[in-house]
């Protein structure tokens, strides 16, 4: 038996070494047939002696039992997006902003992979979990699917790595794998994937990991995330950290390069763009990062992106097609947007059949008519956009595009405020289109966060005339909800209960939920902190609004206009009458800010306090409420089923209290 255990260990190590040579070094050392022979021998031994199977065995990539749904995972550190530049002038301006603060620097450049961003965590060198980026704070647990990707090591190489390592990178589908996948689908008469990115995303989000295992996905790391202990010595440059990842067996693109000047970055960009079609994977630009970690730390971040990095996007791909007609859509704030119906055309990796014309000014600028041949571009390889008319191809029967004087949905008057490009329906919540979008926004996760109130549910509620305004949501009964498709009494009762829970919110969330133009989460929070009460907000004028942080003349005008409309005030009053409420925001004297300067973290389920209430009350006492535990955390509040944050706090020696202790502090 000892000999069998030894052979299994040797085969596992040998196959993992071959995987490293193949996927990381790009220098396979044995033929595929020999690899298959070794793998089959290992499978046979493990089948007979499963007790000797190792966690990093390549046989563990075949996939396991199908999941019912993906669990949500909170990232140890936010996964931010990148700002973009689209030409040399914009990149030069980006470089100037950096060097004005840091002096001379170098950049680490790499292809911008067009796949799905993921976070992979290793503990003691062993693959522990993986998650999608999601909204940057929370992603989906795709551990079992990522485990099937052959290029991702299940155990890090060597022994010189931290206790905990978070690897961030992109899951991609190589062109060869994409073509083979579509060939199989075509042979079976199944729907084809449009591009490798969609194929990678669809494959990674399969509830059955065996399907993911069959899709030949790849992975390239582009950064380190959280590392514990924090004192562990990492390389002092981004390139050096990528080399550390490579030494641990993690795949890193061979195209990564350090550039010491703007000219070298431009040269690198042009070279990658020229070779774009010959690369084995899809890319849509180049990512440029300040190489020195010390400079990255000093430059910091804006709300959702680092100041020290940017994506230098390739010029959008363009094609010609026919403009067959124009539809007019109405959005949440009443904006009437012309949408061009196009003869379907394949551009930038997708088939495009619609494109926005933005507004009447854009139609006039283009001089476009129905029947024209137009040039379509995917701006930033994302948003289809009409950029020009091919005038010489205009037919004799081309028709002018007439902007409607009345709303195409509710027949209310369409008005255009002087100085604004957008025309808007004046129907407000009387307009079904605005009503649907307004209520979807009201129920969304960052607003009142009504669990289970998805877009399709909202649309049915309005179509069946069960809801006319946000306040009507709080009058719904379970029996009425059963009128909706696929809504039994059990689901209806659960949804009504979720609506009732949502009545307890915060002033900031309530303001955001109202859907006031240009008032996002941050502005809503600033308004709540400044005015503290709804009555004070209602009584304010434009001059007062401008005194609030981040509120300029435009937002102030939108606020004043919103609060001057009787039907908006009626909606607000009805919401309050329906029981929507939030904890009072009281003026706190400086000496009463007992938690000023402290950083607190909440984890687990709070049974007596709403999490938003707890966060708001801690902030009123001067505390900063963070989303993750670090050595700078002063206190962790651990509710029921506390997980990794609690373990990390205990490891770092951070003070931990329960909900009862929190209530005592807040009272």
From Swiss-Prot:
Family annotation (PROSITE patterns): BRCT (PS50172), DNA_LIGASE_N1 (PS01055), DNA_LIGASE_N2 (PS01056)
GO biological process: DNA repair; DNA replication
Keyword list, A-Z: DNA damage, DNA repair, DNA replication, Ligase, Magnesium, Manganese, Metal-binding, NAD, Zinc
One cellular-component annotation, GO: cytosol
Active-site residues, as the UniProt record annotates them: 112
UniProt key word Zinc-finger: no
PANTHER family, alphabetized: CHROMOSOME TRANSMISSION FIDELITY FACTOR 18, DNA LIGASE
Protein family membership: Belongs to the NAD-dependent DNA ligase family. LigA subfamily.
Protein name: DNA ligase
UniProt lineage: Bacteria, Pseudomonadati, Pseudomonadota, Gammaproteobacteria, Alteromonadales
């Amino acid at each position: 038996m000892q000999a069998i255990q030894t052979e299994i260990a040797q085969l596992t190590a040998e196959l993992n070494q071959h995987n490293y040579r193949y996927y990381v070094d790009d220098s396979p050392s044995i033929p595929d047939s020999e690899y298959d022979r070794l793998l089959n021998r290992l499978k046979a031994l493990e089948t007979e002696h499963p007790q000797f199977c190792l966690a990093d065995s390549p046989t563990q990539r075949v996939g396991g039992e199908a999941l019912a749904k993906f669990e949500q995972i909170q990232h140890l550190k936010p996964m931010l997006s990148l700002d973009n530049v689209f030409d040399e002038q914009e990149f030069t301006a980006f470089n100037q902003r950096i060097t004005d603060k840091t002096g001379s620097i170098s950049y680490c450049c790499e292809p911008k992979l067009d796949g799905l961003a993921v976070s992979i965590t290793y503990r003691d060198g062993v693959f522990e979990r993986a998650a999608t980026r999601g909204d940057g704070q929370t992603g989906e647990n795709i551990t079992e699917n990522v485990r099937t990707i052959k290029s991702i090591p299940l155990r890090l190489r060597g022994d010189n790595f931290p206790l905990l390592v978070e690897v961030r990178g992109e899951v991609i589908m190589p062109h060869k794998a994409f073509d083979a996948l579509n060939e199989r689908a075509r042979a079976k008469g199944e729907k084809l994937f449009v591009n490798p990115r969609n194929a990678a995303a669809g494959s990674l989000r399969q509830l059955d990991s065996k399907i993911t295992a069959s899709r030949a996905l790849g992975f390239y790391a582009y950064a380190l995330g959280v590392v514990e202990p924090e004192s562990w010595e990492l390389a002092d440059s981004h390139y050096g950290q990528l080399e550390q990842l490579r030494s641990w067996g993690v795949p890193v693109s061979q195209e990564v390069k350090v550039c010491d000047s703007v000219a070298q970055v431009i040269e690198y960009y042009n070279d990658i763009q020229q070779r774009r079609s010959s690369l084995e994977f899809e890319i849509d630009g180049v990512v440029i990062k300040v190489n020195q970690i010390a400079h990255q730390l000093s430059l910091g971040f804006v709300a959702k992106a680092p100041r020290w990095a940017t994506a230098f996007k390739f010029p959008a791909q363009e094609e010609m097609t026919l403009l067959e007609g124009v539809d007019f859509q109405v959005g949440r704030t009443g904006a009437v947007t012309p949408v061009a119906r196009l003869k379907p055309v394949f551009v930038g990796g997708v088939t495009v059949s619609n494109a926005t014309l933005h507004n009447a000014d854009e139609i006039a600028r283009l001089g476009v008519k129905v029947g024209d041949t137009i040039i379509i571009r995917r701006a930033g390889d994302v948003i289809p956009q009409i950029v020009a008319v091919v005038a010489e191809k205009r037919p004799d029967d081309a028709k002018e595009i007439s902007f409607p004087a009345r709303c195409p949905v509710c027949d209310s008057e369409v008005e255009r405020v002087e100085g604004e490009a957008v025309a808007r329906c004046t129907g407000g919540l009387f307009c079904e289109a605005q009503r649907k979008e307004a209520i979807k926004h009201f129920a969304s996760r960052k607003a009142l966060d009504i669990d289970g109130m998805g877009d399709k549910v909202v649309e049915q509620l309005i179509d069946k005339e069960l809801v006319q305004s946000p306040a009507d949501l709080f009058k719904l009964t379970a029996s009425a909800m059963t009128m909706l498709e696929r809504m039994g009494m059990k689901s209806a009762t659960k949804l009504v209960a979720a609506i009732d829970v949502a009545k307890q919110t915060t002033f900031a969330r309530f303001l955001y939920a109202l859907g006031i133009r240009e008032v996002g989460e941050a502005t809503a929070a600033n308004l709540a902190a400044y005015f503290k009460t709804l009555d004070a907000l209602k009584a304010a004028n434009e001059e007062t609004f401008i005194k609030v942080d981040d509120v300029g003349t435009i937002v102030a005008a939108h606020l004043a206009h919103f609060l001057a409309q009787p039907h908006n005030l009626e909606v607000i009053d009805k919401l309050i009458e329906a029981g929507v409420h939030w904890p009072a925001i009281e003026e706190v004297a400086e000496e009463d800010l007992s938690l000023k300067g402290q950083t607190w973290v909440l984890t687990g389920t709070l049974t007596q306090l709403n999490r938003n209430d707890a966060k708001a009350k801690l902030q009123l006492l001067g505390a900063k409420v963070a989303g993750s535990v670090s050595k700078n955390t002063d206190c962790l509040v651990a509710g029921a089923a506390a997980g990794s944050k609690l373990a990390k706090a205990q490891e770092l020696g951070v003070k931990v209290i329960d909900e009862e202790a929190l209530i005592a502090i807040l009272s």
